[in-house]
């Protein structure tokens, strides 16, 4: 095995499941820290924690090659005061807890990757935002990211390399955004959303996983990393690409006012669809990371080839 131990805090979600499966073939142990117990599957073991207090899970942190913190309440909800508090606390509290625990370990994780979101950048239709010159936006989603990253970088951990991964929208067949977009296409509703000019910072799920392993093996890299495909596309292009690949010739567009009504009905926010996220993974590209799926057409065709 290449690695001794991989730890996934909050690793029962979409991306965590992908990482657990991938690293189960690369590591002796994969440890998932989760709120609910789960039977061990092969070398993947779940240990219960609440993300707020220390417990028996702390000993598992010793000698880990990699700790990935994936904790966070789903933002696909209405931004009520209660939900806003839960969204922030579910990210900040586990991050601070992990930092405090790592400080006292004899053999702390070699690399700690903390998730963040590429939505931290401003609404951008004029040019791409990268790690060097990107402009931070404003609003609740950005405040969440700023608090999340601040709670991460407030730690001084000389024995642990630290990376915050500003994730784009991971696209895959089984979960995440793609199945929902595909359902709209199947219903004939796969036209542009709003004016369709807003950019979507996507990344194929395989590239998201490979980025994390690449970071594990490139010890000179730390700090802020954008995890998005290099070829961002507009919402209109994304929807047209899915329609064409699936063989649906048309798609009824959804104007912004109708999206606002629909968002209230299903309990979400239009910002998740209408904000233009044009983000470039400059650090990955500058340091030689090679995307398997850099073009949206390649990614969509691959995902749709995985018929279930």
Predicted feature residues:
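C-terminal amphipathic/interface module of NAD(P)-dependent oxidoreductases
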Residues: 1, 250, 271-308
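N-terminal Rossmann NAD(P)H-binding glycine-rich loop of SDR-like oxidoreductase domains
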Residues: 6-26
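NAD(P)H-binding glycine-rich loop region in Rossmannoid oxidoreductase-like domains
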Residues: 45-94
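Conserved Rossmann-fold NAD(P)-dependent oxidoreductase catalytic core, especially the SDR/UDP-sugar
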Residues: 96-138
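Glycine-rich "substrate-gating" loop/helix at the edge of Rossmann-like oxidoreductase active sites
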Residues: 136-139, 168-175, 195-205
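Conserved beta-loop-beta element that borders a ligand/cofactor-binding pocket
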Residues: 150-173
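Alpha-helical substrate-binding/gating segment
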Residues: 182-190, 198-232
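Mid/C-terminal beta-alpha module of Rossmann-like enzyme folds, strongest
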Residues: 215-266, 301-304, 308
């Amino acid at each position: 095995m290449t690695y001794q131990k991989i730890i996934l805090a909050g690793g029962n979600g979409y991306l965590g499941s992908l990482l657990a499966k991938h690293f189960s073939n690369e590591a002796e142990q994969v440890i998932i820290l989760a709120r609910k117990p789960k039977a061990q599957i092969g070398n993947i073991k779940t240990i219960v924690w609440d993300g707020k207090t220390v417990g028996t899970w702390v000993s598992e942190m010793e000698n880990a090659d990699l700790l990935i913190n994936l904790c966070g309440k789903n933002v696909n909800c209405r931004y009520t005061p209660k939900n806003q508090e839960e969204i922030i606390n579910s990210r900040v509290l586990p991050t601070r807890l992990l930092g405090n625990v790592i400080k006292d370990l004899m053999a702390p994780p070699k690399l700690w990757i903390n998730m963040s979101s590429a939505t931290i950048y401003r609404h951008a239709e004029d040019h791409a935002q990268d790690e060097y010159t990107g402009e931070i936006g404003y609003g609740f989603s950005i405040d969440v990211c700023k608090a999340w990253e601040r709670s991460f970088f407030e730690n001084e951990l000389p024995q642990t390399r630290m990376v915050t991964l500003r994730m784009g929208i991971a696209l895959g067949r089984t979960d995440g955004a793609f199945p929902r977009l595909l359902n709209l296409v199947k219903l004939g509703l796969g036209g542009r959303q709003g004016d369709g000019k807003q950019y979507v910072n996507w990344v194929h799920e395989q590239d998201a996983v490979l980025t994390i392993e690449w970071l594990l093996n490139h010890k000179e890299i730390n700090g802020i990393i954008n995890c998005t495909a290099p070829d961002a596309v507009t919402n209109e292009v994304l929807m047209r690409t899915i329609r064409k690949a699936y063989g649906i010739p048309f798609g009824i567009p959804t104007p912004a006012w109708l999206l606002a009504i629909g968002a209230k009905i299903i309990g979400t926010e239009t910002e998740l669809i209408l904000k233009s996220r044009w983000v470039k993974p400059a650090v990955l590209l500058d340091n030689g990371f090679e995307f398997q799926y850099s073009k949206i057409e390649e990614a969509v065709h691959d995902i749709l080839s995985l018929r279930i």
